[in-house]
Amino acid sequence: MSSGQSFSHSLLKLPLSALVKGTAIPSNPIDDHHIDINKPIVYALPFRSAVDLLTLQKHALELGLPDPLSPLEIHGKSLKRYVFIASRPTLVQSDNDVPSDSIALFSDLLALHAEDSELDVQVIPATVLWGRKPGKEGNNKPYLQAMNGLQKAKAVITAGRDCLVRFSPVVSLRYMAQSHGTDSSIAHKLARVARIHFSRQKLAASGPDLPSRQVLFARLMKSPAIEQAIEEEAKSKNISMEKARKEAQDIMDEIAADFSYSLVKQGDRLLGWLWNKLYQGLNINNAATVRRLAQDGHEIVYVPCHRSHMDYLLLSYVLYHEGMVPPHIAAGINLNFFPAGPIFRRGGAFFIRRSFKGNRLYSTIFREYLAELFAKGYSVEYFSEGGRSRTGRLLPAKTGMLAMTIQAMLRGLNRPVTLVPVYIGYEHVMEVATYAKELRGKRKEKENAGLVLRTLRKLRNFGLGYVNFGEPIPLNQYLNEHAPEWTKDIDPMGASRPQWINPVVNQLANKMMTHINDAAAANALTLCATALLASRQRALSKDSLIHQIECYLQLLKNVPYSKTYTVPSESAEALVEHAISLDKFVIETDTMGDIISLDRNQSILMTYYRNNIIHLFALPSLIAQMIIRQENLTVSQIQQQVAEIYPFLKAELFLSHKEEELDELVVKVLNELVSQDLISLKADKVAKNQANTLTLVLLGRTISETLQRYSIAFNLLVSNPELAKADLEQKSQDIAQRLTRLHGINAPEYFDKGVFASLFSTLKQQGYLDSDGNCDSEKTAQFATLLYALLYPEVKLTIEESVFQLKSA
């Protein structure tokens, strides 16, 4: 570096340190991008800019990366550690050519690779973005453009606190040299590729240009589908075309978002304060996968589970802080009340009625609006379950939005569309007490400003929040596999609804929900709730609770559930202490130590948190229950019984393991139970270890309530094979409700109608009922006997008596 450059850099550092507070994306690029700091590193920046270079230097050093201003020494040659892909324009000219010194550096590096087969220089593309405000539609400026000195000074002053430093995945010059050679033309190609890459980085951070709402509405009104719907509306209601158009305009105004970057920017500060007040921290996992999709130009559709109204804010906040554009969010029309509605709308929410069946004009406009969002490249978010889960379990997907997404693809989108399942978890859900009341029959309170204010008064520390991005589902690839000729149905007019859509959407919905559950986050509260609710008295000594949590942790770590779920890194003791700090348990002390318990009200509320992760333990719990309730089992018998019961658990809990994987999985679970000294395995015989029976019993009881529900339904069918679907569901509910009173079962979902409706579908899929609803009596009786063997005697007796009474009535 020349003395002049060194002096100018020194002059710039002081004002930059005061004005610039940037955010590095990702926050840990060494791990996220698998950067090997022992190999030579060169940074590539889009434009010649001392300000950008110094901003990059500050963040690189903070992140443990080499100083971009330090020389790179290779085989006795001293080289620059940074390159600019384009020259900085002055006030009177603009130069988009690649600087000659950058080409020279690339050429030198490629030549060194030709001489040394072991050399591998890592090029890290780095973009310094000053503000993330999207452009306006109709403005034909490039997404990323250089600034002259005055423009850069203004950007530093106005957007220095909104600066992003994006580190992209490394480009291996060894790979480039081996794949494309080492002549000088490759240096030019490398620079051109980098320029495209930088534009995508800006697009991923700011999003597409935004239209004014009136321009958007005018464009939608010219849609042939909407024009036809308006004509039909006028005819069917016998009103004028002008009145029908006004009705269409009103519907558009009701639906459409009015995205405001300034509100998002200001809201980020408010949300930052809110999360710090509410939560001790946010754990975010697998965001790098989503960033890659955004950078590669995918149309991203976020499909999170729905726990709380907080979900709307949390996911947008997380995406913004991960350097991505907050999505346009499908929100229920019930949230369109003052003042929340206008704020949500400017934050990207578009509103959807709970039902618009039979309203052709509304459904057409909504479908066209959604297709417009996809066509323009805006990321979209809709909640897969339709509404918030009141039980903590993942609900079956509502498929309407998913079907409209597929229909939008049939317009001929020119970008790949990818679903990104998202698991959202909390150690405290603000509405959980309300959910319990609603499940007991209390009418849902309509959302309003008063409800918001009452909620805000309850703000306190709610522990940790979790956002886990699941395995993406590329829709183009999915359709290629499940509807190979789908491209033949592409119709730019949007009239296509081929016959294959419904079955494909139903399969896709199930896959989507499974991927959400695959990304579950176990945490201190969900684990402690699972253990305490498995105890008959909802109480355990502190030592027993710690021991049980340790059992869960070892199972989750040693028998992995999926690639995307997360397990706490803390010890069992630390997790129990953290859960106690959340003030949800009753703590009593005697001469032998602390006893941790749940009162009746908290027992009901804790089922919500247990249900968040019950699927993670479904199979280990089932195996433990088999060992506890049956003597002298062999491994093969356990495998056979698991194979019979698993399809019901898989359908209800969206489990991901395939049936052909079960035998191997059973062996892995058994081996883990052996390593924990809970059971012994001798000559294929399984026996429980009497010294550690409590841990095994608690593990088994996690799934016992689910098995009880199955037993109720199957014993009703054995008693009366001709029961119709509605009767089976109602009688099952009645018996389940009776069991809750007689046996102190506090789970509100225990007699939920939806659970029994799902069970009925699985009965048909597994051949216990044929397509006409006729029962296979022998098969049903055998399965009922198996389920009975897994129940405790007192529960078994209540089911027998209840079935007999209903039959006699």
Swiss-Prot record:
It is a peripheral membrane protein. It holds the Pfam family Acyltransferase. Keywords: Acyltransferase, Cell inner membrane, Cell membrane, Lipid biosynthesis, Lipid metabolism, Membrane, Phospholipid biosynthesis, Phospholipid metabolism, Transferase. GO terms for cellular component: plasma membrane. It comes from the Bacteria. GO terms for molecular function: glycerol-3-phosphate O-acyltransferase activity. CDD domains: LPLAT_DHAPAT-like (cd07993). It catalyses: sn-glycerol 3-phosphate + an acyl-CoA = a 1-acyl-sn-glycero-3-phosphate + CoA. This is Glycerol-3-phosphate acyltransferase. It comes from Vibrio vulnificus (strain YJ016). The gene is plsB.
